[in-house]
Amino acid sequence: SSYYRGGHNNFQDPYNSFWRSAMDHIEQSDGKEDAVKFDVDYRFADDSWLESARAGVRWSERDQTTRFTSYNWGVLSEIWGGGGPGGPVWMDDPVNGSPTTAGGSSTVAQTELYPFTDFMRGKVPAPTGLEARPFYGDNIAENYAGYSAFGLAVANEWGDRRDINNCPQNWVPLAQRCDVVAGTPFRPQEINPMVETTKAAYGMLRFKGDLENGWKISGNIGLRYLKTDRDTTGYIAFSRGAFPTETDCSTATTPTAFCLLTPGVRASARAFQNGALIKNDLSTSYDYWLPSLNVRAQITPSLQVRLGLSRSITPPDVGLVRNFYNVALGSNDQDIVNGRPTGTFGIGNPALKPISGNNIDGSVEWYFAPVGSLTVAVFYKELKDVLTNSTERRSFTNNGETFDFVISKPINSDEKAKIKGFEVAYQQFYDFLPKPFDGFGINANYSYIDSNGVPQNTLSSTDPDVAAGRVANIDTALLPLQGLSKHNANFAAIYEKGKVSARLAYNWRSDFLLTVRDVIVPFAPIMNEATGQLDGSLFYTVNDKVKIGVQGVNLTNEVTKTTQVLNNDLLKAGRSWFMNDRRYTFVLRASF
């Protein structure tokens, strides 16, 4: 078959493009929670410093099942081979799902030309020049069945490739993979039930009174006890082998990295990847005592001071405690270490505990006008069991064979993290101005946050994957805690007068840590660089029930930049740039 010649001298022509790959992914989770609570409240006499006492108990059971398939990428056709003489399945080829039988329906009708007009607002040349490109034209989300049927027909047209277990090696829809649960697109290891049972009890005293110097004191003191039991169901799933056979290795013109291994290692790898599924149910429990004290002192009618002491917990996201292992050896050059294939994969951690924190915060608040205030707050937090990432080399044994893998998972750090800082906030409506300017106001704040991260458990500097640059071993204790910027500033100009409401707000933050581990080689920490965004809104109240307006987001068209941290000197290099565009929304709000 010719290519890009004769009457087919442009990339817009389906003759010059082929169907290369497809991917589907399905999430279908469900859950329910049953809860029972009982509270009692007792109020003291009006002349007592004790205002009220409250106590209660609560029981809850959350039953949740996460169904989360792999990202099912697979080849449809390729330039380097196929079942027929034409190599890949070109976009103008007839397709009937058979590489050896002529005829079928043209796939041109499945394409749609996309010209990439106004690419990056015209500031960057379009990657396609002046030519459009053909792409799959149907709506995949709305017509998944059609997408699946078409992709399967193309893949079978190129060649129905199967391994020694009769499992497809080219792309097939999720539900047609080997080992799925009947009637579903999910394999057993992709279905992760979890039951969490929590028992809690608390007691709290509220108090209020006046000191001899005229200060008015109020607040509360309390204690909560919480115990959680978590039971998870999961599997250690060993992949079915997709390695070349001995015949493939002996007849290959250019042997693959796997075929260059010794025959004994090749045989061991094939035996290891036999599709075994091993049940791996896990349970964990944790309990906490959580005291708290909050005190407010009103020094004058316009000046007050607050102090808070507490211990708090933040449970891990349910996606992090999924119980699954997908163990698969690789066969490419980078997967061969010391003459043996290895693999790299991520897992959940059903034993994760909540992040716990000891918190101190205080503030001074000055209400200098009925619609004006100036506040200064300070805070300190000491965090324990901070979530971080662990990367380790671990051996797995299956079918009498043992191989090494590099696995990553979320863990609770043994190190403590600290957060300290302050915030200054000012807000005021200038109602002393002449009309109509008396509706103008300002809301502004600045916060400073100093945080130290915790080290990420990673491979040693002598590990082969680190030496080869496939895994970073940066000390993440040198970085701030995830998601925290050192400097944060917000400024909003407000107008509220009669039926008109307007707001123009600028929010800015300095750089912050997005993740301690990127999803691709070399798995380095990723920073989000300093960024600011201007938003605005204007609303008009038609009557008590109807309001109309317009909202604008990212009016300055801010570009978000991320960087990767390269070494312990915190040298950074560009990772990605995102242009989110300006967004305008016209709003009609009505109540009936």
State each model region's role.
Residues N507-V519, F539-F592:
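C-terminal beta-signal and adjacent terminal beta-strands/loops
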Residues R43-A53, F68, G97, D210-G219, ...:
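Short loop/turn motifs that connect adjacent beta-strands in outer-membrane beta-barrel proteins
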Residues F379-L383, L387-V516, T556:
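Gram-negative outer-membrane beta-barrel transporters
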Residues C178, P188-N192, T262, R266, ...:
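Surface-exposed extracellular loop regions of Gram-negative outer-membrane beta-barrel proteins
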Residues M194, T284, I313-T375, Y380-L383, ...:
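Outer-membrane beta-barrel signature, preferentially recognizing the C-terminal barrel domain
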Residues Q28, K32, F44, V57-T65, ...:
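Transmembrane beta-strands of outer-membrane beta-barrel pores
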Residues A22-E27, F186-N192, G275-D281, G346-P350, ...:
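Extracellular loop and loop/strand-boundary signature of outer-membrane beta-barrel proteins
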Residues S1-W19, W80-P188, E246-I278, D335-I347, ...:
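Flexible glycine-rich, low-complexity coil/linker segments exposed to the extracellular/periplasmic environment
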